[in-house]
Amino acid sequence: MKPSFLLCAVLGLASTPAFALDPLSYAHYDQVKTRDVHLDLNADFAHKTLSGYAELTLDWLDPAARTLDLDTRGLAIARVQALDAQGKWTPAPFTLDKLDPDKGQALHIALAFQPAKVRIDYQTSPDAAALQWLTPAQTMSGKRPFMFSQSEQINARSWAPLQDTPAVRFTYSAHVTAPEGLRVVMSADNDARATGKGGWNFTMPQPIPSYLLAIGIGELEARSLGKRTGVYAEPLRIKSAAYELADTEKMVEAAESLYGPYRWGRYDMLVLPPSFPIGGMENP
């Protein structure tokens, strides 16, 4: 009797899904996964919004799937397009579910085929959960506004339509425009010598979960701390920030002596205005 019981147990396991989907995400990443995200955004401090588009590169896992479900929260979706086999962007119908207080809104995109890419034109809400818009009075100089993000735990969906779950990791790039005199930084490769003329460009070549998407915009200066370490801060704070963090390069070297080469390229830090209410957030 034991072999029969064992066989039944094995058959029972075979019919069970390989894994449970994230209950706080609308994404069906067992059918399709995001491989790369490109963001093209404009920062509007007067209206406290980011607007533009997100372009998602997809890996389809289920040949029968014809719907892409994404996580959003408070996003105004203007248009969705899918890239066809001829390289042409074609309109794709979409619907937004009612707002759930915990999960936000599901964006359902109906597709006639399995596109390699989809592009979503959208605008964030002025009260987007992940974006903090500071007035000049909340900065050290008191002259210019400031914005920073906090995507953890599931707030990335409030500033980009994504598969907002740690079960999905993707590379990303971004082009961001901001008012003159303000620097944009992101959780990606930042060029300290960039001027922002024509916009700010970023690339993250290593796959990350959505909660590690980060952006900061403000009156910022860059200071080198070593061959691959640096700090960004407001002009009135950059000197003290660089002094406080002067041993960062040594710290990275000490970590490498224990655990091997540092794999993220650069180790840069952003020191936020004094009104920042959180101790800190680590981003690649």
What are these language model-derived features?
Residues 29, 107, 122-172, 218-225:
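Glycine/proline-rich low-complexity spacer/linker segments in large multi-domain proteins
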Residues 22-24, 36-42, 103-109, 156-161, ...:
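Short structured motifs
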Residues 74-139, 201:
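A surface-exposed beta-strand-loop module
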Residues 36-38, 49-55, 65-67, 106, ...:
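Intrinsic-disorder/low-complexity, polar/charged segments enriched in Ser/Thr/Lys/Arg/Asp/Glu/Gln
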Residues 52, 150-154, 162-284:
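Hydrophobic helix-coil surface modules that form long, contiguous segments used
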Residues 4, 8-16:
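Bacterial N-terminal signal peptides
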Residues 55-75, 163-164, 172-179:
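Surface-exposed beta-strand/loop patches in extracellular or lumenal glycoproteins
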Residues 18-53, 63, 141-146, 166:
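N-terminal, polar/Ser/Thr-rich
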